[in-house]
């Protein structure tokens, strides 16, 4: 007979109620304690439900009811401080549904909580007016005890704290941990609760704001957000987020009405629409309040059998709309965790529970830290925090393509999310979520990043160090022979530069490169031809390694955003470099002159871009989301890189057949020749880059090839096929592997679903 197991949930908000529904669906015993007299008071701001939360709500059977009481976000608008439209996209809702299966919906917090509460089958397990005052934690696998203000005692095998920012459970967890295990709770967890902004939130009727979408208004050190409530109701929710004069630390008590009135009077003349000011909006409001916007992510969210979720564990700035959705994700994680422990008969096994809770903590800290950083960046930009943010918000970003600049960033906040593994799978769109992918991106450790960058710098400088300290200076061939070898090697370096510039061009068309040092390949090519490829390539790769260490990086589309350019890669390559080769031969009279190759390096990205524009304008091909969020460009990349690899191999074979014996005999003494030194540096750097790429793919589980096998293949290819062919081959291999690993993959779905 199975040993009884009870979950004790503290808090009847979004996190607590969704967890209760999931536990009922999974057949777990539970009780829920809520300190207020009503789980769905008619107070508070609205709730935005994004695809990552919507798909879980769909699984537990409440999504349709949520939609009936909500308004879909069909469009997106951003306004300048003068009330002028700087961004408008009427297709946002349609695109989100196509990509992720669900639109964003917005409804009142009251309706959201009421729908969740009504879904609970055994309402006798929900106890109101039960304010927690003391907890006695049990060891893992044992029971814990909770005492409420009215003297009641409740027990549970695991205690889930979901009682919000001002959490009694968190306070008790810290008290117990500090008493029993001093130092377990990091100092940062207690001092890292901060507030940079204060918000006034309100509900207005028939305010004159546009229906059917969300709107944001930018202003100096403040911003606004507006959203229709239930569709057709005339109800609008609005937020004023104002930057505090000083950063506030610690859990902040409720703010007074004087603070609210002060902010409203200070900004009453702000233009938040063509014919609407904040003062006029406030006059049409039936409800308003002021709240401190606190932000934190705890590094420790459990101790013994107490686990924190929702706003008890982390608090995000509401500008990104991920607070409630993250709570839903965490509830799903906990429910699946308990199901899996039960399936293994490990609900009372301390080691198994410890491992499961540690996995929860690790994954959720990474996920919510990324969400917090993204939300903070968005708020700083919308409140024009400094001249750079002001320029980005009002001048630069409005000129960017919405599909390329906004949707991938928005999607990267959705797709790392989980869903319930043991209920009917949710609807899907073009974009897979984390459980649908083979790849399992994790943030790269700072130590690993530092190590790769350090080794890369040492590798790039190794030929210079070797030439200075390890060569004798004597060689057995004449200066004329050395000059001929140098000319041939310069020609091979030119071919290697084609492989490098081809990689740079492709990377410049990725969504993650849009606002980065990689947004254009031309500056890198210009610098390489001026200062040398052997000096610029290591800098590029160091920047690349540093910029790709976040987990969000791999949830962005990894392929090219312009199908026309992808199709034009190979034709542009053949035309530009064939012309360059012919001109070089005709003008040199048999001597190698690389000036035409330099011209070709500049011309290639320009010709590819112009050819792509022509193809997009004159032929029918997929556009917008059907390109950016697909792998349709991969075959064109493959042909392009295979051509470079073939030419690079032929050139290397010709070089090896003519000078291979000389190079082997002379060894390091050849480093006296600058061309040899440059090629040696480029070879070590490109080889190390290929080794890093293989290691990184394996680290995120994007390839089944072992690191040792991949490295041996890369080293063998470099020796026998040359660095140009190896770089091109490794680059396209990594692109194909990553594209497959971040596309839909057969989900490890339990056959025992409900």
Swiss-Prot record:
One Pfam family it belongs to: FAD_binding_3
Entry's family note: Belongs to the paxM FAD-dependent monooxygenase family.
Chief localisation class: membrane
PANTHER family: FAD-BINDING DOMAIN-CONTAINING PROTEIN-RELATED, FAD-DEPENDENT MONOOXYGENASE ASQG-RELATED
Membrane topology (UniProt): Multi-pass membrane protein
EC number: 1.-.-.-
This protein's name: FAD-dependent monooxygenase ntnA
InterPro entries, per database record: FAD-bd, FAD/NAD-bd_sf, FAD_mOase_fung
Species annotation: Nectria sp
Biological pathway: Secondary metabolite biosynthesis; terpenoid biosynthesis
């Amino acid at each position: 007979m199975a040993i009884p197991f009870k979950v004790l949930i503290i808090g009847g908000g979004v996190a607590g109620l969704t967890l209760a529904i999931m536990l009922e669906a999974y057949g777990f015993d539970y009780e829920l304690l809520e300190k207020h007299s009503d789980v769905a008071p008619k107070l508070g701001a609205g709730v935005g439900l994004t695809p990552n939360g919507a798909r879980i709500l769909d699984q537990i059977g409440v999504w349709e009811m949520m939609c009936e009481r909500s308004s879909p976000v069909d469009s997106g608008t951003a306004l300048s401080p003068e009330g002028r439209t700087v961004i408008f996209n009427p297709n946002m809702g349609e695109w989100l549904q196509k990509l992720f299966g669900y639109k964003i919906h917005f409804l009142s917090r009251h309706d959201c909580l009421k729908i969740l509460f009504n879904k609970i089958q055994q309402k006798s397990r929900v106890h109101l007016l039960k304010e927690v005052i003391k907890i006695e934690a049990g060891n893992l696998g044992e029971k814990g005890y909770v005492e409420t203000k009215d003297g009641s005692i409740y027990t549970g095998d695991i205690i889930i704290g979901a009682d919000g920012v001002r959490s009694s459970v968190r306070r008790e967890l810290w008290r117990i941990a500090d008493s029993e295990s001093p130092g377990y709770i990091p100092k940062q967890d207690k001092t890292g609760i901060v507030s940079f902004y204060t918000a006034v939130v309100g509900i207005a009727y028939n305010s004159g704001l546009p229906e059917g979408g969300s709107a944001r208004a930018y202003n100096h050190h403040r911003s606004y957000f507006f959203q229709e409530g239930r569709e057709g109701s005339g109800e609008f929710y609005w937020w004023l987020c104002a930057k505090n004069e000083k950063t506030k630390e610690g859990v902040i008590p409720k703010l007074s009405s004087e603070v609210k009135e002060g902010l409203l009077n200070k900004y009453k003349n702000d233009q938040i629409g063509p014919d609407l000011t904040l003062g006029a909006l406030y006059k049409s409001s039936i409800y308003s309040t002021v709240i401190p916007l606190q932000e934190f992510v705890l590094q420790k969210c459990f101790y013994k059998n107490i686990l924190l979720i929702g706003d008890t564990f982390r608090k995000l700035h509401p500008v990104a709309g991920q607070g409630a959705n993250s709570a839903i994700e965490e509830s799903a994680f906990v429910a699946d965790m308990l199901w899996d422990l039960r399936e293994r008969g490990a609900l009372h096994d301390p080691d198994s529970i410890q491992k499961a809770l540690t996995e929860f903590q690790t994954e959720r800290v990474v996920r919510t830290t990324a969400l917090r950083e993204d939300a903070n960046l968005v708020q700083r930009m919308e409140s024009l925090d400094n001249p750079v943010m002001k320029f980005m918000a009002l001048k630069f970003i409005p000129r960017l393509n919405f599909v390329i600049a906004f949707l991938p960033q928005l999607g990267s906040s959705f797709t790392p999310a989980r869903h319930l593994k043991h209920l009917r799978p949710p609807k899907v769109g073009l974009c897979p979520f984390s459980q649908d992918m083979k790849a399992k991106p994790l943030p790269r450790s700072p130590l690993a990043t530092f190590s790769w960058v350090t080794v890369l710098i040492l590798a790039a400088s190794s030929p210079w160090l070797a030439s200075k300290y390890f060569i004798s200076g004597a060689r057995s061939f004449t200066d004329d022979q050395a000059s001929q070898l140098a000319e041939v090697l310069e020609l091979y370096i030119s071919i290697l530069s084609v492989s490098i510039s081809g990689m740079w061009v492709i990377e410049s068309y990725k969504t993650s490169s849009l606002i980065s040092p990689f947004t254009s390949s031309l500056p890198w090519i210009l610098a390489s031809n001026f200062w040398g490829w052997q000096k610029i390539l290591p800098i590029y790769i160091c920047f690349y390694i540093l910029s790709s260490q976040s987990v969000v990086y791999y949830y962005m589309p990894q392929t090219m955003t312009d199908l026309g350019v992808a199709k034009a890669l190979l034709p542009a390559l053949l035309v530009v470099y064939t012309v360059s080769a012919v001109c070089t031969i005709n003008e040199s009279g048999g001597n190698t002159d690389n000036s035409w190759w330099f011209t070709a390096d500049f011309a290639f990205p320009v010709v590819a871009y112009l050819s792509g524009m022509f193809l997009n304008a004159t032929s029918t091909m997929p556009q917008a989301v059907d390109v950016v969020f697909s792998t349709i460009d991969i075959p064109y990349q493959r042909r392009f890189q295979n051509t470079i690899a073939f030419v690079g191999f032929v050139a290397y074979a010709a070089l090896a057949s003519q000078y291979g014996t000389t190079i082997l005999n002379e060894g390091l003494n050849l480093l006296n020749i600058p061309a040899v030194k440059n090629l040696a540096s480029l070879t070590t750097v490109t080889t190390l880059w290929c080794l890093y790429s293989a290691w990184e793919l394996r680290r995120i589980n994007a390839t089944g090839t072992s690191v040792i096998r991949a490295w041996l293949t890369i080293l063998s290819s470099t020796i026998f096929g040359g660095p140009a062919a190896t770089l091109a081959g490794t680059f396209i291999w990594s692109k194909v592997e990553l594209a497959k690993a971040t596309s839909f993959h057969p989900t490890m779905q339990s056959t025992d679903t409900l």
